[in-house]
Amino acid sequence: ELTYIVDSTAAPVCVLIPISTWAVFASRLLVTNGVTTEGESLKYFIKTIPYNFYAWAALIIVLLLILRVIPPLGRMKVATERVENGGPLAPAGSEKIDIRGNSKNAEPQTHGKMIDFALPIACLILSTILCDVDMQKGVIITLGFMFVLYVSRGLISASDFADCCVEGIKNMLLPLIMMVLAFLFSYASNRIQFTKTIIDTVFPFMQNIPQLMPLFIFIILGITEFITGTNWGLYIIALPIVIPLSAAIGANTLLCISAVLSAGVFGSHICFYSDATIISSSACGCDNFEHGLSQMPYGF
């Protein structure tokens, strides 16, 4: 349930916030495809926010689940009953993808302060920006900063700090492998033009029903996203086709663009091997496949 909440407040929230990377990326594509001008792209993106119905629905449903207006369903119900009966929090096999590793079993430390958490985060943000938004350099600088901050104050020994770094890399290995395989599958789907083939095959039949084009866009692209998990790749492929086609047959271009954005969010949220699904599972210590199955009733 925790993994579902985290996953449902990731991509759905990003596409509703004008300052997110999703907004910047989509706005740039709108300029590239001639929908709006450079200075007006963000304003046009903001117009799509009220019509991004899947993102809104995902947030509303997760809130209703938290408040128990909507009860746990399917595998989530089974998991809830397991925990209530004294069983383990995570399903079997979750330890393989849990990036928290052995930290859950570690002895609690009482001498840490909030500043020990806040300063490294601030250092990571600042160093990444100063290094031309190079996250790799930012992480290396932050690790050095943390070493000085913690070891000099006796919070941790130098050898324990090194052990923590190695253990962290080991815990991230399986999620990273899954991410690489997911990107490989997405790349292969793009190379064979899977999404474009589906669009070219189905969309010509919409010429006589332009009012229903946004609905068909979401359904068709949602299915392809569930299969491929391309997320932003969908926008690159679909928007150059959807925008001129919607204008040509008299469909509402704004609604059609919103439907494309919604389909991308749907794929990021529901696809078993999308980056958001894998990272959410890893962060919460839940088996990726179990998480994907348990959130399906709510996503669909």
Residue positions per predicted region:
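Core transmembrane alpha-helical segments of multi-pass membrane transporters/permeases
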Residues: 129-152, 159-196, 211-223, 227
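Helix-loop-helix module between adjacent transmembrane segments
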Residues: 3-20, 52-55, 182-190, 224-230, ...
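Long, contiguous bundles of hydrophobic transmembrane helices that form the permeation core
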Residues: 36, 41-45, 58-131, 139-164, ...
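Short amphipathic alpha-helical coupling elements at transmembrane boundaries
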Residues: 4, 44-47, 160-171, 197-207, ...
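Helical membrane-embedded segments and adjacent short helical loop/helix-boundary regions
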Residues: 51-55, 108-120, 137, 166-179, ...
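Hydrophobic alpha-helical transmembrane segments of multi-pass integral membrane proteins
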Residues: 1-6, 179-180, 209-244, 248-249, ...
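Membrane-interface alpha-helices at helix entry/exit sites of multi-pass transporters
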Residues: 1-9, 38-46, 250-255, 284-299
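Re-entrant/interfacial helical elements at transmembrane boundaries that shape
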Residues: 1, 17-35, 233-244, 261, ...
